[in-house]
Regions:
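Phosphate-ester processing/binding pockets and catalytic centers
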Residues: 2-268
């Protein structure tokens, strides 16, 4: 989730559109990153976002989870509903904890037919007339700040026309890559290092996509370091943020209680 004051959105969207034109690409998406051309285009968007974040004009918050942890490793898991619940977790966390629960919010998610955004909006507004365990993600803190914020709209946006949707896709994809392909990134780092291993291990085969995505992840880490954004890569969990209040926050979700389980499909 990239969040900022409304008047900035049009400005940043316009700048990303210009950057893409200069790079001769129609759209930047993490999964499309397989060439130097796309890499350079994505790095320009990363630079732009970090430039605004560095002067506290936008936030970048990403939620990552392990589909094999105790919460998600359940029989009959409803992946669509689980994704929706995680969106709710992220929205609640950013609005209440990072923006202190204030403001009138317009939310523009990338088009995703899996998510019922009207339902998400209704849950966030607490106006659903039927039971839904997604509601459990809105805790006492959310209700405490309910009078201070208003969610006026949740409207899907076409990422081809909306640069900020491309930007959050890049940061989200990069964060997920850092966890799911952490062994590949570690192997890539070893190959780039001039130091020889004392105890060589079996090498992992790296695809062209692994190499390009690892290059961008490393580039982003270097750029954040120059701006004193304290995010690091850890071998067991990927990108890690120690201070969630800083302008770029990668939140690795862990089960909150023993009863914290992903939703199960109906009639399973």
């Amino acid at each position: 989730m990239i969040s900022m004051r409304a008047e900035l959105a049009e400005e940043i969207n316009g700048k990303i559109q210009i950057l893409n034109q200069e790079s001769d690409v129609k759209e930047c998406k993490w999964y499309k990153l397989e060439s130097a051309k796309n890499r350079f285009a994505i790095q320009k968007i990363i630079d732009l976002c970090l430039e605004y974040a560095d002067i506290d004009r936008l936030r970048i918050d990403v939620l990552v989870w392990d589909s094999e942890d105790s919460r998600h490793k359940v029989i009959g898991r409803d992946d669509n509903k689980n994704l929706m619940n995680m969106y709710i977790q992220l929205l609640k966390n950013v609005i209440v904890k990072r923006w202190k629960g204030s403001g009138v919010w317009q939310i523009f998610p990338d088009q995703n037919s899996i998510i019922d955004w009207v339902h998400v909006r209704n849950i966030l507004r607490k106006i659903d007339l039927y039971d839904d365990d997604s509601d459990s993600y809105l805790d006492r803190t959310w209700n405490q700040f309910k009078s201070l914020h208003s969610i006026v709209s949740v409207e899907e946006a076409d990422s081809k026309l909306t640069g900020l949707c491309q930007a959050i896709d890049i940061f989200t994809g990069m964060s997920v890559f850092s966890f799911e392909k952490r062994e590949a990134f570690t192997e890539w780092g070893k190959r780039k290092s001039p130091q020889q291993e004392l105890f060589p291990t079996e090498k992992i085969e790296l695809s062209n996509k692994d190499n390009e995505q690892s290059t961008v992840l490393n580039y982003c880490l270097e750029q954040m370091a120059t701006k004193n954004i304290n995010i690091r890569f850890e071998n067991n969990s990927g990108l890690v943020t120690k201070d969630p209040n800083q302008v770029v926050n990668v939140w690795f979700y862990t089960p909150q209680t023993l009863s914290d389980k992903a939703p199960i499909r109906d009639n399973f």
